[in-house]
């Protein structure tokens, strides 16, 4: 295994001495330099593999990168070399936006958690697509998911317009498209998870996808990312709505607004979505309920609080077909990818 994998625990104190968002940027820039120098070429080959079928696609393994780490699709190739079975980038909005004021990302180390209120900060669809089309990841067999959202200044009643623009833009370049309706950092966005609102949005996206599928001679799977802060009744309504509108998969889950697991910790009162270890059990409950409701009709990608191979296994056992990592990478480093794949491979024997 590359020395850079083993060096992350040594580098972490220096990174954690920085502002969380600055450390994020420094880490991505360092990874890109390592990729450009050829240092990362062996990483992918060093990782255990576990071929997995997901929504008709063949993944090298069922451990993916969650959206949010690379919002602008600028580091796809470098991230793809860490051994992920699939990579998801975004969320991208039609127009560039700066997001919420800084500071807007906070670590809670005692809980292996993170709070962010970034607010879909990104360079916009045109810049995003320029980065995606420059990437070689897909041409080398990688599976790429592109995550779309709405601009903060788009009225919620016009949200479908932004998603339709996003879908049309990313469609030719995506192996699957994720519709992000669950970030807590865009005002009223989670209202789109309601039955009527969700049904109207998905009906519009379904019709647009049919048009794009004919135009591009291929049907790209459509996935919806949902929140963990849902009642069982709400989960059932969402599941039924996804099924009735021809959606292919669901990502469970996004960040939580709950602070029950981190009360009293520094930064716990900050506004934003909480990710990391405290989300694991919440995500498991949503996955279990979804699987009970949809049977095998929908693919489920489990995300939230995976900091070990065992927790990846628990997501799969709860009903997920694949998993994604984000905050766990901040606390554990890139070695977490191989650990999760290895654990799942051993479980499958």
UniProtKB/Swiss-Prot annotation:
Localization per Swiss-Prot or TrEMBL: Cell membrane
InterPro entries per the record?
Aldolase_TIM, DHO_dehydrogenase, Dihydroorotate_DH_1_2, Dihydroorotate_DH_2, Dihydroorotate_DH_cat, Dihydroorotate_DH_CS
Mind listing the UniProt keywords for this protein, alphabetically? Cell membrane, Flavoprotein, FMN, Membrane, Oxidoreductase, Pyrimidine biosynthesis
Q: Which residues bind FMN?
A: 67-71, 91, 147, 180, 225, 253, 276, 305, 326-327
Quick one: which residues bind substrate?
71, 116-120, 180, 185, 254-255
Instruction: Read off the Gene3D superfamilies from this record.
Output: Aldolase class I
Q: Which residues form the active site?
A: 183
In alphabetical order, the GO MF annotations are:
dihydroorotate dehydrogenase (quinone) activity
Residue ranges that the Swiss-Prot or TrEMBL entry lists as coiled coil: none
Q: Does the keyword Plastid apply?
A: no
Which GO terms of type biological process are on file? 'de novo' pyrimidine nucleobase biosynthetic process; 'de novo' UMP biosynthetic process
Subunit structure, as described in the record: Monomer.
Give the family per the record.
Answer: Belongs to the dihydroorotate dehydrogenase family. Type 2 subfamily.
Name of the protein in question = Dihydroorotate dehydrogenase (quinone)
Q: Which organism is it from?
A: Bordetella avium (strain 197N)
GN (gene name): pyrD
